[in-house]
Each structure stands twice: as structure tokens, then as C-alpha cells.
Design a protein with these regions (language model features):
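Extended redox/cofactor-interaction regions of prokaryotic respiratory oxidoreductases
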Residues: 2-7, 178-263, 270, 288, ...
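Phosphate/diphosphate-binding loops
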Residues: 500-501, 548-567
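Long, contiguous, secondary-structure-rich segments that constitute the structural scaffold
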Residues: 559-611, 703-705, 709-720, 724-811
Length: 811
């Protein structure tokens, strides 16, 4: 909807009923006890327009943080400043060709661009790492310092001593992307790379062993289903915009009238009146629930046996690999005929999950009798210490019922999307083949030369030769804020004889920026030209041609220029390989031309500068994961050793027998339930009786937008706690409480709400650390990682950031 009459907008009467019916954010707002929208800011913008404060220009751009969406923005500029933001106003906003409208985060982007705390000049550290003490230096000094130190470290330690830290603060662009330092390092011999991500480490690893890849049906395919079952899946907060999934889920359910069941410790915003049933569950126990559902499906003959026989390995003895022990198949495990001798009955699972046995039986019968059924899981359940096993256990429900590879079904993972075929700015090939897990970089700094393949998941060689000595940190708050166990990370980074140089390229003085040795001010993507691709786009792909809204202010520079200048200092061959003789503008035109060659109907470059976005609906109507495999498994085998769905994995059986694992670190050849560490039944609960889980908060994307005042007011940082637990501790809603465990401590307001299971607490991840790390180390900003662990999960060596035990007291 394009605003042409601000007076009419402000005079319009919006009823509570119409807001709830027509707006996802309406449901979201009314479901929350403390959610207020900054309508006064809208009134202010409308007053500007009404007074004739007309923009000198308006340009198309995009919000490119890591929510999984890339929403179109129309930035109105006057006096070289963005003063008003619209979103997508193109087309007729029809289903399948809808407007990619931004959420409140994207719509507040001018507050990020114009924020008084943005970095302005290059700086070097003059205090201890983490103190935030810097002095201004010239660009030449900064670039020379980086170049000299990088050359020294490459000479003294080799390319494996250089690492590019995981970061997603600039994500989704092509050249404006957190990955661009990879290209620079690959142009000069490579670097120690990583596998996995903080988002999906465990599920990606698990699905590679089960399906040979991680893929799901597009959310619009819910139009063809009879039942939607969501395990820890909350797109209404994680992907709530027009570029995300919530729109598709709503539209598809209108067409199918599918029943929707939400399984989550919290009554999340995806439920929030949309669901037919909410089943609250203890964090980390989804695998036990899945096993009990499987028990009902098997004992009541609700499985698709022909599918299991034809497409799968290891359901029963008929398809069990010859290398496996007797009764090592999935059916035996579920029925209690395997090694543990425990039947996975609903009564067994009820004690673990807190879901009553009769509810489990009812859910199992619904899943077994509704075909197709769209069973999916978000990325929350896998972000646990037992996350790999949980992800496989949930996916087994789709496998057992034969819902894989068909319309209206799913593989049991998160929703998939179509690919438009955008040409990407190549990161070049990395000559260094050694890799570490995305989560173990602090270990690689602290004791890298001791890290091995069988204990730490090192890939490409048996052990690391050298620790990390040089760290690139571009648009990344992972250095301290987004990584597990902040206190431990702080101690590792303090010793600058370990990691000798940390280079930060940032927009703000984040918690992580305070630990950098050289800190460079970056232009935001909205201040640059780029070709930006969709991500969570359902069955409609799109690409945005963003233009710079304003000229560079102070001494901020684009990342491409910055790294090109570093490349010059590394040698003319490195510079040529990195740039290929092109400017950023020339690269954008080149990438546009390549993308257009794959999509001939895409507008020419000059035309697209005016239209902003190109949309293309999937020709197959709905994307179906593993469809080709389902139709002809011989011609289209999966990327597993057998070419089939591997319920029993011989590769995992080998790892379980050869890797160095602690007693509570389990790799299993079957999708078996394992409790994990720091879970609901860990002995540590005697000291810290409440489970603490994280969630993705609508006020931020990870830590991006975490310093925007109106979003902080609309969505305050709180700890969710059930009234039963609050009453036992004398806590009332709004009280400041002390949350603590063996890792750290924070002070935070309490949100006392029945929307969370008793015995469980929750904190939205991504809030900015506000602690004196040289003093009491008590966080007052609500950063959950002051409480999380740096111990990785068993298989993926990923972040178990939702497996935490805490105590909560009134402060």
C-alpha cells in the first residue's frame, strides 16, 4: 500500500478486530503483554510530508540482515539524509506476485543509517581488548598496519593461521556481504575456513547423513496439506516480513484450511491465535516425543511400509546394512527390542517431555491418518547439545508416514524455497583445505595446535598445525556477543600473544568491536549499489537492484574499496585476482547481466534501477524437496552412500566408535533420543533448577537493530518465566531479576507469563552485552551468551546455545 495522503492515514480508524484480521503484526502485538507500536513516529513522518517536506530523490534498496528475508525498501532522501522509508509498492500485490514488504526492523532502517553512534573514522586500539579505548588514525595507517601484519603472519605461521570470523550483520547482498574477506584471503593463498553455521550446524550435519542434504518443501505447499505440525518453528518472529515465510503460511492455510499444531516451550507468535493446538514441551526433548509418536505409528500400523521398504535403509531387518549388529534397526529401537531394551511408549515420553501420554497418542494418530502432512521443524530444536539427534528424530515422522517428496508433505526440516539463479560474486577457491567447526574458533585461538579430527572435528587433516593468529571480523558481533560463554571468550581474547591481530570492519561500536585491534568504519548496504537476492521466498523468487541512498559521510568506506586497498598492499597479483580489474559498479553490472542471461524477462540494468525489484514465480507452482528421488530413486539417488534415506547410518556408526566422546556426548547410527548435556535431566539441575532457552526476537535480527530505540521500546528485553515459577520466587511482572549459572550472571526484567512452560525460562538472543568484563562481569543488557556454554555438540561441533540451566532470583 503506497501512502499518498498522510492526513487520511492518521485520521483512519483502525479497529482492534480489523487490525488482528488483516495484520500479522496486529496478532503479534495483541498477543504480547507489553507491545506498543511507535505510532507517534509515523505521525511525525506524516507531518513532514503534509508540510511539504518533499524528498529530493527516492531510491530502491533493501534490508540485508540475516533474518532469511531480503525486503524491498524505498528510501526518500533530502539534504543527503534518508528521512522516510517505504517498502514494496510495486505491482498489484497478488498471491504469487506479492509485495515484499519490510517488517518494523527494515522500516526503521533510517534510524540505523542516521544513528549518532555510527563509526566515523579508522581507529586503533590503545587500551586492553574489550575496554573500548581507541584513537583515530588515518586510512593509510590503518591499511598499512593490516597489510604489514597480515604479510608477517602469513610468512611466520602460514595461511592456516588466518581465519574469517562468522558474521551476518551484512548478509544477502552480493558485494555488500560478510563473506567478501574470503575472496581476499583466497586471492593470497587461502585461510583456515569453517564448516557449519551458528544457525544450522546440527541440523545440516544430521540431514547430510540422513538425506544427503538439508531441504524442505516450500511453505506455499501447505495449500496442499491436511495437517501442519511445527516443532520449534516460529516464522512469525524469525521471518515475519513479506520476504519471509509467515505470509505464505497464512495464505496457504487459507486455501487448505489445514489444522496446525505448534510444539514449543513458548506460546510463540506463530501460534498466537493462529494455531489449532499448542503443545508446550521441555526444551531438548523433541526427540523423545518423536520416538513415542513413532511407537504409536508402528504399533497401530499407521506407517507407510512400502515407502520404507523402497526408499529407506535401516527401518527394520529387511533393509538393515550387513555391518550393523542384530536388532540395530529403528523398529527394534522404538519397540524396546534394541540395546537399551526400553519401549518408547507415550507413557515413557510423557515423563521426559511433560506432554501427557494421551496427547501424544492423539498427535500420533493425527499424523498417521492425515496424508499429506506437512511436518517441519525450526532451527531452535537443533540448537541444543543433542541437536543432531533431535533433528533426525523429528524428520523420521515424515519418513515413517511417507510424506517425503510429495505435494503437501515435507522432509521434516524447515521450509525450502526456490532459487532464481542469481549470479554471485565469487569467493574463489580456497587453496587451504583444513577446516574447523564454526563454533570452535576460540579453541583454535587458545590451543589450536592441540585440536584433532577425532576430538574436535578438524577436517582436512588429522590435527591443526598452528593456532589462529589473525582474525577478520566483518559485520560480526560473534567475537563476543553472539558466541557461547562470554566470560571464557573474553579471557581467550585478552591474551594478544595468542591471536596477534583482530581487524574489525563495522557500523557501530558493538561489544565485539571493542575487542578489535584495528577498527574500520563501513558503509551500510543502503549507501552502496548492489544486486541482492531473496532467501526465504517460498515459490516466488526475486532480486533487488539497490542504489546508494546517500553519499559517504565522514570517512566511511565500502567493504569492496577497503579490501581492494588491503589487496594492493599484499601485491599486484593479489589485487588483480581480487578485483579482476573491475570497480564495484562494474561488478554489479556484470552480475546483473549474468543473472539476466538466466532470466531473460528480467529488466535491463537501467530499467531495473527504476523498478527496483524483479519477481518470478516458480514454474512448478510449489517447490517439493526430493521430488525427483521419490519419482525415480534409481535415476535420482540421494547424496548418501546408499542413495537412499539412511535411517541407520553406517558412517555415524563408524564415528561413534572412533571419535573421542564424553559419556554425555552421543553419536548414534539411528535417530535415537539422547538427553544431551545441560538438559532437563542433567544433575546440574540440583543447583540450577530452571531450563533456559533462547529464541529469535522480533526486535532484532540476531544483534542487528539491537540499538534502535523504537524497537527497544516496542519489544523490551525480558526473561520469560511462568507464574508458578515466579510466585515460588516472589517475582512479579516487571521486577528486575538475577539470572545466573556456572557461566555467568545477568540482571534483567521479568516477563511473568503463562505463555511458557513451568520449569522453563526464555530470553531473546542478540541483545547487546552491557557488562564490565574487567569488573563484576554482570550483564545488564540481556545478552543470553553470558549464560551459555562454549562446549560444542557431539557431531557437528555446533553451538548448543538453547541447552542451559539457570537459577532466577529477585534482585
Amino acid at each position: 500500500m503506497k501512502i499518498t495522503n498522510p492526513e487520511a492515514l492518521m485520521a483512519a480508524s483502525i479497529s482492534r478486530r480489523s487490525l488482528v484480521k488483516t495484520s500479522a503484526i496486529g496478532s503479534l502485538a495483541l498477543a504480547s503483554s507489553a507491545f506498543t507500536l511507535p505510532f507517534s513516529r509515523i505521525a511525525h513522518a506524516a507531518a513532514d510530508l503534509a508540510s511539504g517536506n518533499v524528498a529530493e530523490k527516492a531510491v530502491w534498496s533493501s534490508c540485508t540482515v540475516n533474518c532469511g528475508s531480503r525486503c524491498l525498501l524505498r528510501l526518500h532522501v533530502k539534504d543527503d539524509t534518508v528521512y522516510w522509508v517505504e517498502s514494496d509498492t510495486t505491482g498489484n500485490d497478488e498471491y504469487g506476485n506479492h509485495q515484499v514488504r519490510a517488517c518494523l526492523r527494515g522500516r526503521s532502517i533510517r534510524r540505523r543509517m542516521n544513528h549518532p553512534d555510527r563509526l566515523k573514522y579508522p581507529m586503533k586500539r590503545v587500551g586492553k581488548r574489550g575496554e573500548g579505548k581507541f584513537e583515530r588514525i588515518s586510512w593509510d595507517e590503518a591499511l598499512d598496519t593490516i597489510g604489514d601484519n597480515l604479510k608477517r603472519i602469513l610468512k611466520d605461521y602460514g595461511n592456516e593461521a588466518v581465519h574469517v570470523l562468522y558474521g551476518t550483520g551484512v548478509d544477502g547482498g552480493n558485494i555488500t556481504n560478510s563473506n567478501v574477506p574470503y575472496r581476499l584471503m583466497n586471492a593470497c593463498g587461502g585461510y583456515l575456513s569453517r564448516y557449519g553455521s551458528y544457525s544450522t550446524a546440527q541440523i545440516s550435519a544430521a540431514m547430510s547423513y540422513m538425506f544427503g542434504g538439508n531441504d524442505g518443501n516450500s511453505p506455499d505447499d501447505i495449500a496442499n496439506t491436511k495437517l501442519v505440525v511445527m516443532f520449534g518453528n516460529n516464522p512469525a518472529e524469525t521471518r515475519m516480513s513479506g520476504g519471509g515465510v509467515t505470509y505464505y503460511v497464512e495464505q496457504a492455510r487459507e486455501r487448505s484450511n489445514a489444522r496446525m499444531i505448534v510444539i514449543d516451550p513458548r506460546y510463540n507468535d506463530t501460534a498466537a491465535g493462529r494455531e489449532d493446538e499448542w503443545l508446550p514441551i521441555r526444551p531438548g526433548t523433541d526427540g523423545a516425543l518423536a520416538a513415542a509418536i513413532a511407537w504409536v505409528l508402528i504399533t497401530e500400523d499407521l506407517i507407510d511400509k512400502p515407502f520404507l521398504d523402497k526408499y529407506c535403509i535401516g527401518y527394520d531387518e529387511t533393509t538393515l546394512p550387513a555391518s550393523a549388529p542384530r536388532n540395530a534397526h529403528y523398529k527394534a529401537y522404538i519397540l524396546g527390542q534394541g540395546d537399551d531394551g526400553i519401549a518408547k511408549t507415550p507413557q515413557w515420553a510423557a515423563q521426559i517431555t511433560s506432554i501427557p501420554a494421551e496427547k501424544i497418542i492423539q498427535l500420533a494418530r493425527e499424523i498417521g491418518s492425515a496424508k499429506p502432512a506437512y511436518i517441519c521443524q525450526g532451527w531452535g530444536p537443533q540448537r541444543h547439545s543433542n541437536g543432531e539427534q533431535t533433528a533426525r528424530a523429528i524428520a523420521m515422522l515424515s519418513v515413517l508416514t511417507g510424506n517425503v517428496g510429495i505435494n503437501g508433505g515435507n522432509s521434516g526440516v524447515r521450509e525450502g524455497t526456490r532459487d532464481l539463479g542469481v549470479e554471485w560474486f565469487s569467493m574463489l577457491e580456497n587453496p587451504v583445505k583444513t577446516q574447523i567447526s564454526v563454533f570452535t574458533w576460540t579453541d583454535a585461538i587458545d590451543h589450536g595446535a592441540e585440536m584433532t579430527a577425532t576430538r574436535d572435528g578438524v577436517r582436512g587433516k588429522d590435527k591443526l598445525d598452528v593456532p589462529i593468529k589473525f582474525l577478520w571480523c566483518y559485520a560480526s558481533n560473534t567475537l563476543i556477543n553472539q558466541h557461547g560463554d562470554i566470560a571464557h571468550t573474553h579471557e581467550v581474547l585478552q591474551d594478544d600473544s595468542k591471536c596477534e591481530m583482530i581487524v574489525g570492519i563495522e557500523h557501530f561500536m558493538t561489544a565485539s568491536a571493542k575487542y578489535c585491534d584495528i577498527l574500520l568504519p563501513d558503509l551500510m548496504p543502503t549507501e552502496q549499489e548492489d544486486l541482492i537476492s531473496h532467501e526465504s521466498a517460498g515459490n516466488m523468487g526475486y532480486v533487488i537492484l539497490g542504489q546508494p541512498a546517500t553519499s559517504p559521510k565522514f570517512e566511511r568506506k565500502p567493504i569492496y574499496w577497503t579490501l581492494s586497498e588491503v589487496a594492493k598492499r599484499l601485491g599486484p597479483d593479489v589485487y588483480q585476482t581480487f578485483t579482476e580489474g573491475r570497480t564495484q559498479h562494474e561488478w554489479v553490472k556484470y552480475l546483473h547481466a549474468k543473472t539476466k542471461a538466466r532470466n531473460p524477462e528480467m529488466p535491463d540494468y537501467e530499467e531495473m534501477k527504476q523498478t527496483g525489484i524483479f519477481k518470478k514465480k516458480c514454474p512448478e507452482e510449489h517447490y517439493v524437496a526430493f521430488r525427483a528421488f521419490r519419482e525415480d530413486p534409481a535415476a535420482n539417488p540421494l547424496k548418501t552412500p546408499s542413495g537412499k534415506i539412511e535411517i541407520y547410518s553406517e558412517r555415524l556408526a563408524t564415528l561413534a566408535n572412533t571419535w573421542e566422546l564424553k559419556k554425555d556426548e552421543i553419536i548414534h547410527p539411528l535417530p535415537a533420543y539422547t538427553p544431551g548435556f545441560d538438559g532437563w535431566d542433567d544433575p546440574l539441575r540440583q543447583r540450577y533448577p530452571l531450563q533456559l532457552t533462547g529464541f529469535h526476537y522480533k526486535a532484532r535480527t540476531h544483534s542487528s537493530y539491537g540499538n534502535i530505540d523504537v524497537l527497544q521500546q516496542a519489544c523490551p528485553q525480558e526473561i520469560w518465566i511462568n507464574p508458578i515459577d515466579a510466585q515460588a520466587r516472589g517475582i512479579q511482572h516487571g521486577d528486575t531479576v538475577r539470572v545466573f549459572n556456572q557461566n555467568g550472571e545477568m540482571l534483567i526484567p521479568a516477563k511473568v507469563t503463562p505463555r511458557i512452560l513451568p520449569g522453563v525460562t526464555a530470553i531473546g538472543q542478540g541483545a547487546w552485552l552491557n557488562a564490565d568484563m574487567f569488573g563484576d562481569k554482570v550483564d545488564r543488557g540481556g545478552s543470553i551468551n553470558i549464560l551459555t556454554s562454549h562446549r560444542p555438540s557431539p557431531l557437528a561441533k555446533g553451538n548448543p546455545s538453547h541447552s542451559n540451566l539457570v537459577q532466577v532470583e529477585k534482585a
